Amino acid sequence: IIILRTFRARNFFINYKFLKDYDNLLFIGMQDEYEDLKKQVPNLEFYNCKNFLEMAQIIKSCKFFIGNQGLGYALAEALKVPRLLEGNPDFPVIFPIGKKSFDFYHQIHFEKFFKKLNS
């Protein structure tokens, strides 16, 4: 499961703490974004992508992608991998299109869609 959560477009109604109960979580964003999310998800691993092509290849090979607005989510959307978009209620301009793609603005929906894609 690939995660890329930027500082810029976060939904402050959402937390990722429930992911501590899951394995195989890989963060591919910036080091400081990883360190911030690792406070909530201690089992989160980090990979520093060499370039955007490698990032796209990693996203393409994932079980599913979780992210907010940014390059990572744009790649996941373009590649049509199963994906979860952390929607920003202050700036709702991106919407998932296609099968196995969901957006969430509230914690209950995040956990529900996560379980659906992880089954």
Each language-model region and where it sits:
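Donor-binding and catalytic core of enzymes assembling or modifying cell-surface/extracellular glycoconjugates
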Residues: R10-V93, G98-S101
